[in-house]
Design a protein with these regions (language model features):
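N-terminal Rossmann-like FAD-binding beta1-loop-alpha1 element of flavoenzymes
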Residues: 157-178
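Conserved small/polar residues in nucleotide/adenosyl-binding loops
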Residues: 184-189
Length: 191
């Protein structure tokens, strides 16, 4: 942990959003990100707890707690704080096959499990830090499409197009197989 007192010295700060009246005019990004130095300061708020519940991804009392992907949250928060953005991208990709969209749609269970949130009432901005890492990855060319060098000629069908099905499809595609994802829908659900 780069700044042991970061959670006491630095207030939680999140990105601003364009008003809905402006958002409906186009399909552009409507979250206005923090400047990089301010985002790095948010990474310093992570306490690197002895037991980081934020990355635990477990059920407690029948409720989900922490990141279901077991993302190494304290590690990449510290890398963000240190300005080691390249390493943060690699660390995030170690546990998350799709950070480019999970950083946008994630319900941030990690923030609900954040010890800093329990002690100060203000959890670390994990979701925003993850999104900043992803945006840096695209801007720097670290996150790009990586087609396999050769194809095996085999075709595989994956039943299910949720996160698990897409992760399997991604893995098989990287191995050179042609993959088709099938999504099952019930006609009864439409009634």
């Amino acid at each position: 942990m780069g700044k042991p007192t970061g959670f006491m010295e630095i207030a939680r700060q999140t990105s601003t959003e364009l008003p809905p009246e402006e958002r409906i005019q186009n399909f552009n990004e409507f979250h206005i990100p923090l400047p990089q130095d301010e985002q790095q300061a948010q990474g310093a708020r992570c306490m690197d707890c002895g037991v980081p519940f934020c990355q635990a991804g477990m059920m407690i009392g029948g409720m989900a707690s922490g990141c279901p992907l077991n993302n190494l949250i304290p590690e990449w928060n510290d890398l963000v704080y240190q300005g080691k953005w390249d390493l943060a991208v690699h660390r995030l990709r170690a546990t998350n096959r799709f950070p480019e969209f999970t950083s946008r749609v994630c319900p941030a269970l990690c923030e609900a499990a954040c010890t800093c949130g329990y002690t100060t009432g203000s959890p670390v901005t994990v979701k925003e830090n993850e999104h900043a890492i992803v945006e840096y990855g695209y801007e720097s060319g670290l996150l790009t499409a990586c087609p396999p060098p050769t194809r095996t000629g085999k075709t595989v069908a994956v039943v299910g197009a949720g996160p698990a099905g897409l992760a399997v499809a991604d893995y098989l595609n990287k191995r050179g197989h042609k993959v088709t994802c099938l999504l099952y829908t019930s006609d009864a659900a439409d009634e």
